[in-house]
């Protein structure tokens, strides 16, 4: 019998709802077809946004949406995406498939989408190929509530009132597609550009996100922070509110990657091992951040994460379209548990990407839409949003095929909502073994337990022909005990228990 202990008396940190955020880039069929079809489309829409997609995303309480990139952000010139749709300047999307971008989805459309979703805004600015003036004028266009050239232009384009920009990224992946910069050079450019990202509304601070490292690039983290903190006061905390971090799970490596649907048990465990590895990366990058920011005023912003496979056969390789199986559900559950556990430092995360790209929560084909296994994990984890992380631990054992890629059999996180309800989310990484778990809940008498679970065999997926092969199912296998609860978690599953 596996032992688990929960201590609700020890509240460790608040789990920001933004940890459950998403990412939408002008890439493949994410924006166009996936989200935006235009007002004249036969597909049901409101102001051009697909009704089915918006309603599905509202169900999982999308808290924040990043846009327009990604690598696209550092080639995006915002003025090309405003004004009458038919007269907007076109461009070639050189990063993603070399296709024509008509800019019919721009600033106004993005804010309309966020309005429909009821989510916060996270805009990534163009440092790589844009100017300081261009970035400054975009902020003025979006947020200035007064008479100015940019606010008047906004009004001319149909939006009199300013919008709220909650987060603004100063460049993206500037160590790579955003300019191939060295860390000290980028950091100095960051300091310059962010100076002109002004808070025109004193009651609403725009949180500035500095471009952080990919994977194990600890040198980037160290040098960017050193340069940003040089000759500054403690109150300025490096001129930033957040430092981004990107991590993708490539099962077979960055070159080959591997199939999204055809894999054996060893590749299953290899993939999950790489998902678990993000815990070490957060700890090590976080330790460097602690040297400069011991009070944790700067959030770690994991604004790109997820699985990355070889594209589906017959699709444009620049569109990054991939299927989604129970393997992705486990990656999502594992990763979100880790983010919860590090919520003292991790303040936002954005799954890549929201529709039709990489580890998407939704896939579309014409007027059809399906929810992926990853979607259902976000659905059963949504009660963690803005709850308090409480102290918890569970006994684990290492499982797998090859020694190098073994993983802990279980991961977990526990939060408490304002009304005292405990929410346990647990993943079972085993292909074929269930585990009995005896849980002690300190100083708490359990009255009721509700459960829901996402579980199927490891290759299970939803398709347009069979859209509900993987869904959320009711789980009623919990027994209330004198000290807490006892339950069995099936193989290859993600479980949520609501304990009152």
For each predicted feature, which ranges?
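Active-site-proximal helices and loops of the catalytic beta/alpha 8
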Residues: 250, 272-275, 279
